[in-house]
Amino acid sequence: MSQDYKTTLNLPATEFPMRGDLPKREPGILARWEEQGLYQQLRDNAAGRPLFVLHDGPPYANGRIHLGHAVNKILKDIIVKSRYLAGFDAPYVPGWDCHGLPIEIAVEKKWGKVGTKLDAVEFRQKCREFAEEQINIQRVDFKRLGVTGDWDNPYKTLSFDFEANEIRALAKVVANGHLVRGAKPVYWCFDCGSALAEAEIEYQEKESPAIDVAYAARDAQAIGQAFGVSVPADVEVAVPIWTTTPWTLPASLAVSLGAEINYVLAEGPAHNGKRRWLVLAAALAERALQRYGVEAVVLHGEADGSALENQLLAHPFYPEREILVLNGEHVSDEDGTGAVHTAPGHGQEDYVVSQKYGLLDKYNAGQVTPIDGRGVYLESTPPAGDVVLAGQHLWKAQEAIVGVLRDNGALLAFHPIRHSYPHCWRHKTPVVFRATPQWFISMDKANLRNDALAAIDTVGWFPSWGKARIQSMVDGRPDWTISRQRTWGVPIALFTHRQTGEIHPRSVELMQQVADRVEAEGIDVWYSLDAAELLGAEAADYEKVTDILDVWFDSGVTHEGVLAARGFGKPADLYLEGSDQHRGWFQSSLLTGVAIDKRAPYKQCLTHGFTVDEHGRKMSKSLGNGIEPQDIMNKLGADILRLWIASADYSNEMSLSQEILKRNADAYRRLRNTARFLLGNLDGFDPAQHLQPLDQMVALDRWIVHRAWELQEKIKAAYDGYNMAEIVQLLLNFCSVDLGSLYLDVTKDRLYTMPTDSSGRRSAQSAMYHIAEAFTRWVAPILTFTADELWGYLPGERAEHVLFTTWYDGLAPLPADAQLNAADFDQLLAVREQVAKVLEPMRANGAIGAALEAEITIAASEEQAARWQPLADELRFLFISGDVQVRPATTDEVFVSAQPTTKAKCVRCWHHRADVGSNADHPELCGRCVSNITGAGEVRSWF
C-alpha cells in the first residue's frame, strides 16, 4: 500500500487572501491610514530629504467627482508616492477653486440674485458655505481613490489667507507694470452678465447668416482714380464686405482693406437701374461675383489696398455716418471679399486698427458699443431704416437688419453657414466681443509676452508637443481680461481717481494694507472699508474698484498663495493637469509667474488626455456611456481604477469600458497571485536567520535577483519619466514570463521537496524574499491599497508602511565573471525553448503526457558541451524534464532531441529515475527523495 508523503513536502502556506475583495478591504485600510495620520507620518519620515513638489491644480468646488477628476488625482498620487520611494520629501497639498459663477448660480437658484432676498454680504456668505459643502463631498471621494495628501489642511481659494495672498500677488503684478485699464473688446457672456477670459471659451458648431453687404462710395470718381480709371456718371461704386454677424453693423465705423492685397474694380450686379462696380480682392473676385449672380468677370482696373486708404464710404443704413477705408494687418484674401467691416466695440483687430486711425475719439461709447450686458441694443441706438433696434436683443434683431439691407439694395448675397463659434464654457451659449471698461494684464506693455515665451523654453513638457502648443497660444493671445462684474470673488483692491481714472500712486502699498485686513476678516472688509481709513483727506478724490478677479487669476497665483506661503519654494517641480490646461491653468500660472518673478512657476508640465469610451466617443449622459469612478470603486475597488489609469497611454485620449475594466481586473489578479505565491513559499522564512548571501545562492536564484535588479532600474527610470504604462507592462511581463513561466515553475521542486532548512531551499526563499521586497515597492505607487496589505505579510522586521522606505537595495547585478553569468543564462533559456518545441509534438501524439516523461539529449559544439557538461545532472530541473545528456558535436548549432523515458516515476517528486525502489523502506521513492526525507538531503548548485 502506498505511503502518503504529502507531510514531507514544504507546500506553500500564507494567510494573504487569494481574492482581493477590494471594495470591502480598502475602506478598512483607509480608516487605518486616517487613524495613523499617514500623510504627516510620511512627511516626518522624509524630513531632511530633498523636496519634490507636485503642485495641485485646484478642481472647481461644485458637484461629485467624475472620471476625469479620478484620472488626474490618481496620476498625481502615483507620482508623489514614487518620489517618496526615490528618496524625496514629496508634500502634496490638495486644493480647491472656490470663487466664480457656477457657485453664484447655485446660490441664486436657492436664494435669488443679490438684492432679492440677500444683500451682497449675505450672498457671499452663502457662496462660501456652498463651496465648503462641495469641498467636503469631493474630499471623501478623492480620499477613497487612495490619494494621500494633506486633506486636513488643503488650500482653498476662499480661505482668508489665500484671498489676502491673491491681493498681494496682484500688487506685485501692479508694481511690475503689467496692469492696464481700458474699454477693449472682450468675450462677453449674456448669461453670465460678465466678461470672460480666453480660458473660459469653448468652440462649438453654430449656424450664422453669412451676408455680403455693399458699402457705397461717397465719391465714385475718387475710387476710380485709385484704380487709374474714370467712372462713368451712370455707374455706382461700392466696397462689399462679408460678415457672419449682421448684428454688429449698427456698430460699423469703418471698412478695412489689406494694404498689400491686390484689388480689382469688377462689374457687379445692377442697382436701382444703374451699373455698379465693386471693389474686390483679386483672389476672391470670381467666387464673390458668383455669389452675386454675376457669371462673367469683367474687370475695369487693379490697385493695391494701400491706394484706397482714407477713401470714404456710406454706411448701408446710417446714411449720415461716414465710413473711412482703413488699412489693417488682419485682413486676408483667403475668404469673403477682402474687405472687413470694422466695429471696434466688437472685435479685437477692429479695435486695434480703429485706435490707430483715431476713430475711438470721433465716436461716443454708445456708437462704439451699442449693446448692453444683456445683449440688448441701447436706447441711443438709431433705427435701421424703419426697424427700431433700441430695446431689441441682438440675436432677434439680426433677421430684421438683413431685411433692411435687402430692401435698400445693399444686400448682395445671403446664405446660412455652419462654423466654429466661441461659446461660454458654463452656459454653452454663444458669446460676443463687447468693449467694456475692464482691467487687463497687458501682454506687451512690460514685455510679458516675450518673457513668457522665453520662460516656456526653460520648462520640461510631457508630452513634448505641449511646448509648441502653449507657445502658439501665448504668442497669439490678447491681453488677459482679469476683471469680472460679479459678486463672489476676490476684489480688485484698487482706488481710482474720480476724474482721471488713474490708480492711486501708492496702490502697491495700499493693496498690502488691504490684504492684511482681508487676511483677518475676509473679502467683505473691502466693501465695508471707508476709503478715508487708508487715504485720509484724499478719499474724496478716489473711488473703490468694485470688480472682482477672474477665477483663473485665483488659481493662477497659487504659486504665491500656496508654494511660497507654505514654504515649499518656487518653482514647483511639476504641474500635472488635463490637456485643456495649456490654455487654462498652465497658462494663467505661467503669465502670473513671469509677471511676478520673471520665471515660470514650474519646472515641468505634464498633461493627460480626456476619457472616452471604447469607440473613442466622449463620455456623456445622453450617450449613456459614462462610467462613474464611485461605481468602479464600489464594484471592483480603487486599485483596479488606479491600475487602469496607470496602464493607459495618458498622453492621448484614455479609453474605458466594462471590457477594459475586466481586462485590468484580470491583470490585477495576475499581480496578486504572483505576490501570493511568493508569500506562500516564504512560510517559515526569517530573513534574520535564513537569508543567504547573494554569492552563495544557487545560480538560478542569483540570476533571478539579477533580473529583478534590471527590472527595478527600468521601473525607476519609468517612474522618473512619468511613464506609468511602461511600468505596468514591465510588471506583468516579469510576473508572466520571468516568474510564472520560468522561475516559479522551476523552483517548485526545490522548494517543495528539499529539506526545510537546506541551503538549496533557503536560497530560493532568499531570492523570493528579495523579489517580494522589491515587488511591493514597485507596485506601491499604483496599487496603493494592495501594496499596504502585502507589506503586512512580508517576513522580517520592517517599517510601518512601505512608503517609509526607498527603492529596495537588496538587489544587485550578476557579475560578468560569475560561474553562470547573464549571457550563459540567455543561452540556456534559448535551449529550454528548443526543448519545449521538441516536446510539443510528442505530447500531441501521446508519446508523453508531461515533460517529466521525456529524456533529453543536447548536442552542441565541443566548447559549449564542455561548459554545459557540469550542469547536466541539474539541467532536468531547469527543463522540468527527465534525464538530460549533453554531447559534443561537430557543429556550432545546438540540437535537441527527446525520447520517452522507461524509468519509474517517484510518487513524491514525480521525476522518472533509475533508482526508484532502490530503498526497501521507501520502494516508491527515488534516491534523491529518500535522502531529502531521511538523510542529509541533496545539494543544488545550478538550478
From Swiss-Prot:
One of its GO terms (molecular function) is aminoacyl-tRNA deacylase activity. Catalyzes the attachment of isoleucine to tRNA(Ile). As IleRS can inadvertently accommodate and process structurally similar amino acids such as valine, to avoid such errors it has two additional distinct tRNA(Ile)-dependent editing activities. One activity is designated as 'pretransfer' editing and involves the hydrolysis of activated Val-AMP. The other activity is designated 'posttransfer' editing and involves deacylation of mischarged Val-tRNA(Ile). Belongs to the class-I aminoacyl-tRNA synthetase family. IleS type 1 subfamily. It comes from Stenotrophomonas maltophilia (strain R551-3). Its EC number is 6.1.1.5. InterPro entries: aa-tRNA-synth_I_CS (IPR001412), aa-tRNA-synth_Ia (IPR002300), Anticodon_Ile_BEm (IPR033708), Ile-tRNA-ligase (IPR002301), Ile-tRNA-ligase_type1 (IPR023585), Ile-tRNA_ligase (IPR050081), M/V/L/I-tRNA-synth_anticd-bd (IPR013155), Rossmann-like_a/b/a_fold (IPR014729). Zn(2+) binds at residues 906, 909, 926, 929. It is found in: Cytoplasm. The lineage of its organism: Bacteria, Pseudomonadati, Pseudomonadota, Gammaproteobacteria, Lysobacterales. L-isoleucyl-5'-AMP binds at residue 577. Its cofactor is Zn(2+). GO terms for cellular component: cytosol. It catalyses: tRNA(Ile) + L-isoleucine + ATP = L-isoleucyl-tRNA(Ile) + AMP + diphosphate. Binds 1 zinc ion per subunit. A motif ('HIGH' region) lies at residues 59-69. Gene3D superfamilies: 1.10.730.20, HUPs, Ile-tRNA synthetase CP2 domain-like, Valyl/Leucyl/Isoleucyl-tRNA synthetase, editing domain. This is Isoleucine--tRNA ligase. ATP binds at residue 621. A motif ('KMSKS' region) lies at residues 618-622.
